[in-house]
Amino acid sequence: MPEGGLIVAVDGPSGAGKSTVCRRIASMLGAKYLDTGAMYRVATLHVLRQGINPSDTTAVVQATRELPLSVNDDPASREVILDGEDVSNEIRGRLVTQNVSAVAAILEVRENLVALQRELAATAHRCVVDGRDIGSTVLVDAPVKIFLTASAEVRAQRRYDQDVAAGRLTDLATVLADVKRRDELDSNRSVSPLAPASDATVVDTSTLTLDQVVDTLMTLIEKSAERTAR
């Protein structure tokens, strides 16, 4: 297992399994875990709670400039704090899911959150960071860059199962439509579009179990550590 400082950047679309896999890997590595997607979801929830239309760029930027967000980087914790309240379940709801791409596409919002993400990763020493532009924009010098993906149908089924387990009312067709819509928005936005970094390893998780994905990523991490040690 790699020793010393380590940054692992894991990107990919919604439902690719990033959060589950990264939590497991961070625990195995004794590292911190940073879910940057949750940060954008918190920003979106904050905007919606203020009654702001996500298309009102000026109002969104002003509302998120000093976001009352507290980040828990313990991989065993799913707690996400907005203004003193755990919103870990609410940020996964359909309303936030429908609007997060619009908020995340705003340049000033991304600049503010990217600065925070870089600061948190730098101070963590050992950190597994997941998102959509970590390897390509946020942490371009990360020694390990991985892009997790899967078919839209598989990702929708995973997200649907998560919603059902969390007691959120939905149906598979609606979730699939949301997944495809978000793929389109995230891939075509002008600021940090969703795409693998040029030096990232792409891993398709469509037919892999969680353990198989974890094993694949741990192998990539160990190989990177071996190359660095030479």
UniProtKB/Swiss-Prot annotation:
Catalysed conversion reaction: CMP + ATP = CDP + ADP; dCMP + ATP = dCDP + ADP
Binding-site residues for ATP, renumbered to this chain: 12-20
Keywords, comma-separated and alphabetical: ATP-binding, Cytoplasm, Kinase, Nucleotide-binding, Transferase
UniProt enzyme class: transferase
BP GO annotations: nucleobase-containing small molecule interconversion; pyrimidine nucleotide metabolic process
Alphabetical list of InterPro entries matching this protein: Cytidylate_kin (IPR003136), Cytidylate_kinase_dom (IPR011994), P-loop_NTPase (IPR027417)
Subcellular location: Cytoplasm
Main localization of the protein described in the UniProt heading: cytoplasm
EC number(s) from the headed UniProt entry: 2.7.4.25
Domain of life: Bacteria
GO cellular component: cytosol
GO molecular function terms noted in the UniProt entry: ATP binding; CMP kinase activity; dCMP kinase activity
PANTHER family assigned to the protein according to its UniProt record, in alphabetical order: CYTIDYLATE KINASE, CYTIDYLATE KINASE/PANTOATE-BETA-ALANINE LIGASE
Family, per entry: Belongs to the cytidylate kinase family. Type 1 subfamily.
Name assigned to this protein: Cytidylate kinase
Species per Swiss-Prot/TrEMBL record: Corynebacterium diphtheriae (strain ATCC 700971 / NCTC 13129 / Biotype gravis)
Gene name for this UniProt entry: cmk
